[in-house]
Amino acid sequence: MDLFDRLKELREQGLAEIKEAESEKSLNDVRVKLVGKKGELTQILHQMKDVAPEKRREVGQKVNELRDLFNENLASAKDNLIEKAIEARLEAEKIDVTLPGRRKHVGSKHPIRIIQDDLERFFIGMGYQVVQGPEIESEHYNFEMLNLPKDHPARDMQATFYVDADHLLRSQTSPVQARTMEKHDFDKGDLKMISPGKVYRRDDDDATHSHQFMQMEGLVVGKNISLSDLKGTLELVAKHEFGQDRETRLRPSYFPFTEPSVEMDVSCFECGGKGCAICKNTGWIEVLGAGIVHPNVLSAAGIDPSVYSGFAFGLGLDRFAILKYGIDDIRDFYSDDVRFLQQFRQEED
């Protein structure tokens, strides 16, 4: 069999094998067999030395034409196989649109976040600004600027989380107030601010205590700010959060950064002030601490206490949420039980 006959036979055989290939792998095997470096066409070219000189050009031309034909059919066959594979995958992954859908569970706000957002809107409406500050604080701002001397019990290692000798996890958001007082320009008006955020204390976690909790503190500094201004503000807060029929009272207390200092109670939600287990038969429930800003605190911030005065208050957002929603265990706030959070969906905006 001469080379021309061999080329004719190879043409028919090769095209048939290309057509019969059922996968990209088998098609590639055919390609290697026909046009690879050691394939059939290459073997024919190696036999050119045995061809008469006058026919070598014609044989070479036939080989090139056949190689082009094979490559063209190989490319077309590969495209067809890819298309079939895509169609098969689409068929296998086809979605039955008549099947019922899966319900998406919509998230809800955390109860503490609900309380915080509500109070922020309330105070912003009264002209307050919301100010944030660092959670890792220096002793200077966390204690000294707030009239807490070196020997104060709150500065003890057993009560506070120290990061190093001079820095700690803030034990209240009051340092934000100290930083803000230092920078405030009273020529532009009184300072009215709230500072919400996380605070940290060395408490053993139980149903009513947590080593980390949420606090919101408020501060007003200006000329002729009085205890009656504080009383009126706190009454508005209590009625806003706990109901317009809620009665309030102020009791004398002690805080190093205020003088005089008071604690505010509200009439019991359960018994209306008659006395029950919730209010320990007193008819009242403690909700926050407050007072007139101590002159030493004003002086530390560079404010003349003979010209300016102010009031401050601090409330636990966790405690407000516990009281408002009747939650028994503070640890529920920090659990990962979605069912607990879903109870408060109706309380959202």
UniProtKB/Swiss-Prot annotation:
<dbReference type="InterPro" id="IPR045864">
    <property type="entry name" value="aa-tRNA-synth_II/BPL/LPL"/>
</dbReference>
<dbReference type="InterPro" id="IPR004188">
    <property type="entry name" value="Phe-tRNA_ligase_II_N"/>
</dbReference>
<dbReference type="GO" id="GO:0006432">
    <property type="term" value="P:phenylalanyl-tRNA aminoacylation"/>
</dbReference>
<dbReference type="GO" id="GO:0005524">
    <property type="term" value="F:ATP binding"/>
</dbReference>
<dbReference type="InterPro" id="IPR022911">
    <property type="entry name" value="Phe_tRNA_ligase_alpha1_bac"/>
</dbReference>
<feature type="binding site">
    <location>
        <position position="259"/>
    </location>
    <ligand>
        <name>Mg(2+)</name>
    </ligand>
</feature>
<keyword id="KW-0479">Metal-binding</keyword>
<dbReference type="GO" id="GO:0005737">
    <property type="term" value="C:cytoplasm"/>
</dbReference>
<dbReference type="GO" id="GO:0004826">
    <property type="term" value="F:phenylalanine-tRNA ligase activity"/>
</dbReference>
<keyword id="KW-0067">ATP-binding</keyword>
<keyword id="KW-0963">Cytoplasm</keyword>
<dbReference type="InterPro" id="IPR004529">
    <property type="entry name" value="Phe-tRNA-synth_IIc_asu"/>
</dbReference>
<dbReference type="GO" id="GO:0000049">
    <property type="term" value="F:tRNA binding"/>
</dbReference>
<keyword id="KW-0436">Ligase</keyword>
<dbReference type="GO" id="GO:0016740">
    <property type="term" value="F:transferase activity"/>
</dbReference>
<comment type="subunit">
    <text>Tetramer of two alpha and two beta subunits.</text>
</comment>
<keyword id="KW-0460">Magnesium</keyword>
<dbReference type="GO" id="GO:0140096">
    <property type="term" value="F:catalytic activity, acting on a protein"/>
</dbReference>
<dbReference type="Pfam" id="PF02912">
    <property type="entry name" value="Phe_tRNA-synt_N"/>
</dbReference>
<dbReference type="InterPro" id="IPR006195">
    <property type="entry name" value="aa-tRNA-synth_II"/>
</dbReference>
<dbReference type="GO" id="GO:0000287">
    <property type="term" value="F:magnesium ion binding"/>
</dbReference>
<keyword id="KW-0648">Protein biosynthesis</keyword>
<comment type="similarity">
    <text>Belongs to the class-II aminoacyl-tRNA synthetase family. Phe-tRNA synthetase alpha subunit type 1 subfamily.</text>
</comment>
<keyword id="KW-0547">Nucleotide-binding</keyword>
<keyword id="KW-0030">Aminoacyl-tRNA synthetase</keyword>
<dbReference type="InterPro" id="IPR010978">
    <property type="entry name" value="tRNA-bd_arm"/>
</dbReference>
<dbReference type="Pfam" id="PF01409">
    <property type="entry name" value="tRNA-synt_2d"/>
</dbReference>
<dbReference type="InterPro" id="IPR002319">
    <property type="entry name" value="Phenylalanyl-tRNA_Synthase"/>
</dbReference>
<protein>
    <recommendedName>
        <fullName>Phenylalanine--tRNA ligase alpha subunit</fullName>
        <ecNumber>6.1.1.20</ecNumber>
    </recommendedName>
</protein>
